[in-house]
Amino acid sequence: MRIAILGGTYNPVHVGHMFLAKEIEHFLNVDKILFIPTHKPVHKCVENISVKDRIAMLKLAVQHENNMFIDECDIINGGITYTVDTIACIRNKYVHDDIYLVIGDDLFESFDSWKNPEKIIDSVNLVVVHRIYSERLVSRFKHTYIDNRIFSISSSEIRSRIEQGLPVDYLLPFDVLQYIKSNNLYVKGK
């Protein structure tokens, strides 16, 4: 089986994440896509939103997709989890499968400073997706590049819009938007 893994905070999950998953499914011809929400990201602060809420929103986003699943290995491990540890967890479950680690070019830029990047490369097929750079990044690490220029929206931008009272309709899966509204998430002063 061919499995793509997409890690992130998903704070909140948005249409850019979902469209990217569909692009990965198409271009890599994968059988399964695993969304892996981080418990506590190494380089980000998860502001005032519980892990429970982030998982609930992700479940709503993938509920109608037959080959998209959530793996909570980073949540179960707790604390800060490094990608190399996440991959070891996934490898234990999918020993004989082809695993594709999908990361944005913004993260790929510093890939050589990650914990055990060589071990990551030895364990998975690295896929780099265009996010911010106009040119492809050069690297000593073997990777496949996907030019995904459709959605340049970010979770932080969506949080900011909600905090400012600006519309976010159509930037989020409908059920995720309803969850955010029902639970009063990302509202200024909360």
Curated annotation (Swiss-Prot):
It is an enzyme of class 2 (transferase). Keywords: ATP-binding, NAD, Nucleotide-binding, Nucleotidyltransferase, Pyridine nucleotide biosynthesis, Transferase. It comes from the Bacteria. One of its GO terms (biological process) is NAD biosynthetic process. One of its GO terms (molecular function) is nicotinate-nucleotide adenylyltransferase activity. SUPFAM superfamilies: Nucleotidylyl transferase. Its EC number is 2.7.7.18. HAMAP family: NaMN_adenylyltr. Belongs to the NadD family. NCBIfam families: cyt_tran_rel (TIGR00125), nicotinate (nicotinamide) nucleotide adenylyltransferase (TIGR00482), PRK00071.1-3 (NF000840). This is Probable nicotinate-nucleotide adenylyltransferase. It comes from Borrelia turicatae (strain 91E135).
